[in-house]
Amino acid sequence: MIRTMMNAKIHRARVTESNLNYVGSITIDSDILEAVDILPNEKVAIVNNNNGARFETYVIAGERGSGKICLNGAASRLVEVGDVVIIMTYAQLNEEEIQNHAPKVAVMNEDNVIIEMIHEKENTIVL
């Protein structure tokens, strides 16, 4: 059986920009992407903690060290600058792969700096 499991999470990032007139996507600081192994053009699910919106888009790599989290195109209507978001990817794994799967989670501070990396083996509560 193949199951869809969380693979990576950027937890509690803050939206730094919103650009309605861009073609679409989310731009994320390349350093953050590398820390959690998210690739440019990869599909991501986004949850806005401020208004409850949930949506999907794809990733564009942003400038390293910028802390940039910019929602582009139609997705920009679902956020405001300063909103706290959770950005996730998923992987389809078989039962054997699941046994050794440890998602990478980057916990962010208010400046979009990683303050903790969690390599989840089991369910972990992050406040």
Curated annotation (Swiss-Prot):
This is Aspartate 1-decarboxylase. It holds the Pfam family Asp_decarbox. It is an enzyme of class 4 (lyase). The gene is panD. It is found in: Cytoplasm. InterPro entries: Asp_de-COase-like_dom_sf (IPR009010), Asp_decarbox (IPR003190). Substrate binds at residues 57, 73-75. GO terms for molecular function: aspartate 1-decarboxylase activity. The active site is at 25 (schiff-base intermediate with substrate), 58 (proton donor). Is synthesized initially as an inactive proenzyme, which is activated by self-cleavage at a specific serine bond to produce a beta-subunit with a hydroxyl group at its C-terminus and an alpha-subunit with a pyruvoyl group at its N-terminus. Binds 1 pyruvoyl group covalently per subunit.
